[in-house]
Regions:
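Active-site phosphate-binding and catalytic loops of NTP-dependent enzymes
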Residues: 16, 43-46, 90-100, 156-160
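Conserved catalytic/switch belt of AAA+ P-loop NTPases
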Residues: 63-104
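Conserved C-terminal "switch" segment of AAA+ ATPases
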Residues: 14-15, 55, 117-127, 131-176
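AAA+/P-loop NTPase substrate/partner-engagement loops
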Residues: 10-42, 50, 70, 141
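Alpha-helical scaffold elements adjacent to nucleotide-binding pockets in ATP/GTP-utilizing enzyme cores
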Residues: 3-7, 31, 77-85, 124-128, ...
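AAA+/SF3 P-loop NTPase mechanochemical coupling elements
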Residues: 54-62, 94-114, 164-166
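Walker A/P-loop
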Residues: 1-22, 52-53, 83, 87
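Helical "lid/switch" subdomain of P-loop NTPase nucleotide-binding domains
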Residues: 4, 43-44, 59, 65, ...
Length: 176
């Protein structure tokens, strides 16, 4: 999922800056919109952090495990913030608590969500998401992805290119 999102290009065929946020176990909205600057040790939220890091206002922000947001009041706060972030009628005035009344225009940012169980996602938020459904991959597709993309990256990261090679039978065994 993340690999597909990371390959998205703009109209000039340029890659847009990409960031990843894992929601699994998140239970507080301040992860996105920060804390008031008057609190000791407070800081801005992840959205502002991404804008600063990527030095742009139109990054791709991949939010993983949307269906894992807690069902508490804090989880509802997260859902409310996410709804605001992707709602085109209001995401041009996002405010991080750390910066007070400073409006940030996120209307050019692209938010991508991944999830496993659509039934666990808030219906109001889901209504604002354009859904693309992927069918489960067959074994042959998984082998191709592993051989062409995953293994070369692992070989490079561990410095074992041209040293170790996984036979297709081993890959098949590991996948099954």
């Amino acid at each position: 999922k993340k690999g597909i999102a990371n390959c998205l290009k703009d109209i000039n065929n340029d890659s847009r800056p990409f960031s990843f946020i894992a929601l699994g176990g998140s239970s507080n909205g301040s992860i996105f919109d920060g804390h008031n600057y008057t609190y000791v040790g407070s800081t801005w939220g992840k959205i502002v952090d991404i804008l600063i890091d990527k030095k742009c206002m139109n990054p791709i922000i991949f939010i993983d495990e949307l269906d894992k947001v807690s069902r508490t009041e804090h989880g509802k706060e997260i859902i409310g913030i996410l709804t605001h972030l992707i709602d085109s009628t209001q995401n041009d005035i996002f405010q991080d608590k750390y910066f007070g009344n400073v409006d940030l225009d996120l209307s050019k940012a692209l938010f991508i969500f991944s999830y496993n169980d659509v039934d666990l996602i808030d219906k109001i938020l889901l209504d604002r998401i354009h859904r693309i459904k992927f069918d489960n991959l067959i074994l042959e597709d998984k082998i191709i992805i592993c051989e062409k993309y995953l293994l070369p990256e692992l070989y490079k990261n561990f410095g074992i290119e041209n040293i170790i090679h996984f036979d297709e039978n081993i890959i098949k065994y590991l996948i099954e």
